[in-house]
A protein has these predicted regions:
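Non-catalytic scaffold segments within catalytic domains of secreted glycoside hydrolases
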Residues: 2-50, 55, 59-61, 73-384
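Juxtamembrane transmembrane-helix termini
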Residues: 69-71
Length: 384
């Protein structure tokens, strides 16, 4: 028996927060690897010398909102002294190309003169954030978008549980998480003192952890691992460990980073989409929405090689289902916008819309990926 399609026009969320729903994110990590080598992806991707061209590439595809990084380690090489010479070309290039930017203030890196474990780190980051806000205000901005600390949960795990990169220790992930939350809270308060209308995109991975068997112990372990993804947002909002300074006014836009390997069993085995334990993205988005009731940006998503377009298609489809149910999905940002040598091992990561530059500064275009984005843009425009 055929049924009439459900009319979702009255409940479907209509995104209005950003200049464009489809967006691009530039790889801008400045982490130090275990051997002490700093990996600046803005440099290794060639983006630092191709700012106007790279932003123009996004604009030409209708990606008018983007994420990029203000590299703190370069801006504050000397304590309390800010050299904006690496940032101002980025700001002006974005303006020239009509790109609305979400500026990351710390993406796994910090100035060499600071000890991340000390109280001074928090104070210094807040001072840097304040200086950034003052600069933006002087440049005529009243309500810019910032991400104070990118992916605190992942940074805490990678940097202080498994020593993948700086601070390069093990067994201190919880301690680092609290320190980064303190710094984020202090930075957001400092920014809002200078720019009361500033907005914050608070990014972390969106994951699902399933039980490895049906025993009560395994199910409880999976539940705890799954719910751990919410700790940072709970801390920033003051729900968890309010002594860190968080409160509900700081929990602004939830930024979700979602990749093909973001679902796994509690024993560490990655889930494939055909596994019965796999959860549709729309359900995960609904879970976040009901927990926080905040606007959601899928702040990073992507796959490598030929999987790029099919992965995006699935993410857009699932986001659309969530929006049909009134969930406030405000955008989807593809990552990376341009290819880069992977920060973990220097291999090329062929996941971008555009490839690594040649000697003339030209980048190849991944046609299936770009065509998929264009198709979805048309569909979203027609949907109103």
């Amino acid at each position: 028996m055929m049924t009439e399609p459900r009319d979702t026009s009255s409940v479907r969320h209509r995104p209005r927060l950003f200049k464009s729903f489809f967006q691009g994110s530039f790889a801008c990590s400045t982490a130090c690897r275990g051997e002490g080598k700093r990996v600046d992806l803005t440099v290794s991707s060639g983006h630092d010398t191709l700012l106007d061209k790279d932003y123009a590439r996004l604009a030409a595809e209708g990606l008018l909102t983007a994420r990029d990084g203000a590299r703190w380690y370069l801006i504050e090489e000397k304590p309390g002294e800010y050299d904006w010479s690496t940032f101002m070309p980025m700001l002006h290039a974005a303006e020239n190309q009509g790109i609305e930017m979400i500026w990351e203030l710390a993406h796994f890196g910090w100035p060499a003169h600071l000890d991340i474990w000390q109280p001074r780190f928090v104070d210094s980051f807040a001072a840097f954030a304040r200086a950034m806000a003052c600069l933006m205000r002087d440049e005529g901005y009243t309500a810019p978008f910032f991400t104070p600390m990118n992916q605190i949960s992942f940074w805490s795990w990678a940097g202080a549980e498994v020593a993948m990169f700086n601070p390069g220790v093990t067994g201190r992930g919880g301690e680092l998480k609290q320190q980064l939350v303190r710094a984020s809270v202090a930075a957001m308060r400092a920014i809002r003192e200078e720019l009361p209308a500033a907005r914050f995109v608070l990014t972390d991975p969106l994951v699902h952890v399933a039980s490895s068997d049906n025993s009560p112990a395994a199910q409880e372990e999976a539940r705890q691992q799954h719910n751990a993804q919410y700790e940072v947002w709970d801390m920033l909002s003051g729900r968890l460990q309010p002594g860190l300074g968080g409160d509900a006014t700081l929990l602004d836009i939830i930024g979700l980073n979602y990749y093909p390997d973001n679902q796994w069993l509690a024993n560490g085995e990655t889930l494939a989409p055909d596994n019965p334990a796999w959860r549709p993205l729309s359900g995960l988005l609904e879970e976040v929405w009901h927990r926080y009731q905040r606007p959601i940006l899928i702040a990073e998503t992507g796959a490598e090689g030929e999987a790029r377009a099919p992965w995006l298609n699935s993410v857009v489809e699932q986001a659309g289902l969530a929006m049909d149910n009134g969930i406030e999905i405000e955008g989807i940002s593809v990552y990376p916008a341009v290819d880069y040598p992977a920060w973990a091992d220097d291999r090329r990561a062929p996941g971008g819309l555009f490839g690594l530059p040649d000697a003339n500064g030209s980048r190849t275009v991944n046609e299936p990926y770009v065509l998929a984005i264009r198709s979805h843009q048309i569909k979203f425009k027609n949907a109103g």
